[in-house]
Amino acid sequence: MKICEVEKTLVSTNRIKELGHRPLLVVREKAGGARQVAVDMIGCVPGDWVICVGSSAAREAAGSKDYPSDLTIVGIIDHWMEE
């Protein structure tokens, strides 16, 4: 699992059908880190700190082992002490 900050919504109207219409968000693991695209399963907004899972756990969290995701948001962090 990773802790990431949601930066913004990603709009992609032309997608493969397997992605469906699930929201996509741009997240960053830490300030200055690489941006990644995550499937949002819970309704996050920019500025939220979230818990993300990757690999096969990301596909399962998105609802199917065949879902084409390698990063899925599974929780919003209410409070934590950032180092």
Language model: regions and residue ranges:
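Short aromatic-glycine-enriched beta-strand elements
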Residues: 15-26
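Short alpha-helix capping/helix-loop boundary micro-motifs
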Residues: 34-39
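Short, surface-exposed secondary-structure boundary micro-motifs
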Residues: 9, 30, 55-56
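Residue-level recognition of beta-strand microenvironments
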Residues: 9, 13, 76-79
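C-terminal structural segments of small proteins and small subunits
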Residues: 51-83
